[in-house]
């Protein structure tokens, strides 16, 4: 039981006899509070999916001219960034399907709450670090090429790197929520 600073009455105290106002929060209010991190994580993963898809499309279509210096596949750093965007897209897709199933049916596809919390946290961490690794490999190449010339190829590469960064932000914020959920599972 916890006490309110304004009064000495506990929050979980039963309602007074004959009173229609309960002293504790209702079950619906508690359910809404417990579901807020789940909905926030679902929204963040949807953003990660969108930004990963856009980064993948922009990078994969960054072919200006007939090969040579203006083709993303010429640069291993861009291929690495593209690969990390693909991994993030696949991970976000799997997690979105899993979260949607969890919200609709009330059951998780991963057996055990603690195992599911570990999968969420570890997966978010690995994918977030992979994304930041991919975009940090591609950013210096784009910066170096922009010093020589500023063209559509460099602008498209910079846009893809920025979108990968936004996907990283969404997944890393999702990792914070997953870490919070994992800490609750470790306590319970």
Curated annotation (Swiss-Prot):
UniProt cross-references to InterPro entries, sorted A to Z: CASP_dom
Localization: Cell membrane
Domain of life (superkingdom): Eukaryota
Family assignment from sequence similarity: Belongs to the Casparian strip membrane proteins (CASP) family.
Cytoplasmic membrane side: 1-42, 98-114, 178-188
Positions of glycan attachment: 154
Keywords, alphabetical: Cell membrane, Glycoprotein, Membrane, Transmembrane, Transmembrane helix
UniProt entry tagged with the keyword Transmembrane helix: yes
Protein name listed in UniProt: CASP-like protein 4B3
Renumbered residue ranges of the record's region Disordered: 1-21
Regions of this protein lying in the Extracellular compartment: 64-76, 136-156
Any one of the GO CC terms: plasma membrane
Species in which this protein is naturally found: Hordeum vulgare subsp. vulgare
Transmembrane segments: 43-63, 77-97, 115-135, 157-177
Membrane topology of the entry: Multi-pass membrane protein
Quaternary structure, from the entry: Homodimer and heterodimers.
